[in-house]
């Protein structure tokens, strides 16, 4: 029964995922992270970390907070809004009954300045997946898998040659989270490559039409 319910939710979500590419969905982005803050209490970064240079992070978040000009949440929200407006922070929101319940930070590799130095790009266009976040009430229901499938399909339509993911243990809340994400990537056809002593999960995108 549980497996069937998960499958039904999975299929439903496949058609209720929106690409965060314009200001029209900013409200849903911040609504979602507001819920994460209330239910999990760990949404401080709002997925801005990898999209900012060290200098930007210091000038726009760390310094204003240290000077007492802004609290961390306000500074981070303003930084996230700027990144979205500039097209540097992008990703996908999953919805249930019109409410955002899941998020994945995924975009062109050039949008992640910190990542570019740690994981040099392969030839051709590369779409990167940085992190997933799902509201507690909707976890273990296939939300992340639905998002991942949609991202790979979207990357294929956009002409990307591959999708890369970096489920580093130090970025996960627990060992179980890491193992769970590795399982999801493996099930989606990703293969593990070792680069600079770190695991990178890669899915080659075929040129065939879908």
Please provide the spans of the model-predicted regions.
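Conserved acyl-donor/pantetheine-binding loop and adjacent beta-alpha core of acyl/acetyltransferases
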Residues: 78, 82-89, 95, 99-131, ...
């Amino acid at each position: 029964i549980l497996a069937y319910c998960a499958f039904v939710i999975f299929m439903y979500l496949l058609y209720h995922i929106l690409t965060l590419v314009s200001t029209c969905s900013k409200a849903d982005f911040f609504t979602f992270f507001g819920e994460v803050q209330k239910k999990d209490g760990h949404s401080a970064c709002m997925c801005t970390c990898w999209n900012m240079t060290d200098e930007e992070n210091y000038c726009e978040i760390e310094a204003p907070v240290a000077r007492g000009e802004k609290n961390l949440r306000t500074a981070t929200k303003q930084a996230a809004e700027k990144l979205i407006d500039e097209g540097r922070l992008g990703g996908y929101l999953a919805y249930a009954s019109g409410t955002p319940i899941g998020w994945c930070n995924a975009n062109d590799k050039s949008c992640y300045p910190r990542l570019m130095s740690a994981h040099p790009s392969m030839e051709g266009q590369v779409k990167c997946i940085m992190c997933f976040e799902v509201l507690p009430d909707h976890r273990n229901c296939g939300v992340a898998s639905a998002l991942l499938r949609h991202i790979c399909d979207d990357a294929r339509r956009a002409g990307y040659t591959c999708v890369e993911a970096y489920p580093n243990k130090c970025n996960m809340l627990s060992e179980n989270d890491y193992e769970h994400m590795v399982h999801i990537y493996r099930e989606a056809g990703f293969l593990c490559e070792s680069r600079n002593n770190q695991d990178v999960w890669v899915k080659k995108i075929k040129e065939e039409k879908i």
